[in-house]
């Protein structure tokens, strides 16, 4: 059924599972919001926070339209991969990662009204984020790579 754009579906499903499992583990492992566990003290911690905004805490403060944007992007990407053209490998990876991130954070927004974040790079004082945010950024990088000219294979 999903033979066309197979890598899109594989990346999206695996990414979504990883995102949701890591968020679940975070919620179950910490007693309260704000608790932290240093992996490399002062550099990288697992810190349990909730985020009512977008990636990397942009638009903080309960922006309700983000859940609808996540849903629209997710449905649009799935329709494009299923009904649209056969995508090259980089495009499949790109859109699969973006779907995993958008759908993962979208699920959280619809169920809880916020997203669970836990990756805390303190060395550079960066906002706490999650795997869905990482996947969206990896997807954007893959999409940029897909625009580079590639040599075609000689049969």
From Swiss-Prot:
Q: What is this protein called?
A: Lipoprotein signal peptidase
Family (UniProt): Belongs to the peptidase A8 family.
Q: Which reaction does it catalyse?
A: Release of signal peptides from bacterial membrane prolipoproteins. Hydrolyzes -Xaa-Yaa-Zaa-|-(S,diacylglyceryl)Cys-, in which Xaa is hydrophobic (preferably Leu), and Yaa (Ala or Ser) and Zaa (Gly or Ala) have small, neutral side chains
Q: Does the keyword Chloroplast apply?
A: no
HAMAP family referenced in this protein's UniProt entry, alphabetically: LspA (MF_00161)
Q: Which UniProt keywords apply?
A: Aspartyl protease, Cell inner membrane, Cell membrane, Hydrolase, Membrane, Protease, Transmembrane, Transmembrane helix
Q: Which Pfam families match?
A: Peptidase_A8 (PF01252)
Pathway listed for it is: Protein modification; lipoprotein biosynthesis (signal peptide cleavage)
Tell me which InterPro entries the record gives.
Peptidase_A8
Q: Where are the transmembrane segments?
A: 7-27, 39-59, 63-83, 96-116, 126-146
Cysteines engaged in disulfide bonds, as pairs: none
Function, please? This protein specifically catalyzes the removal of signal peptides from prolipoproteins.
Q: Give the main location.
A: membrane
- A single Gene Ontology molecular function, please? aspartic-type endopeptidase activity
Checking PROSITE patterns in the record gives: SPASE_II
Tell me which EC number(s) this protein carries. Answer: 3.4.23.36
Location of this chain's protein in the cell:
Cell inner membrane
What top-level class of enzyme does the UniProt entry assign? Answer: hydrolase
Membrane topology type:
Multi-pass membrane protein
Which Gene Ontology cellular-component terms appear in the entry? plasma membrane
Q: Which positions are catalytic residues?
A: 117, 133
Q: Kindly list the biological process annotations in GO that this record carries.
A: proteolysis
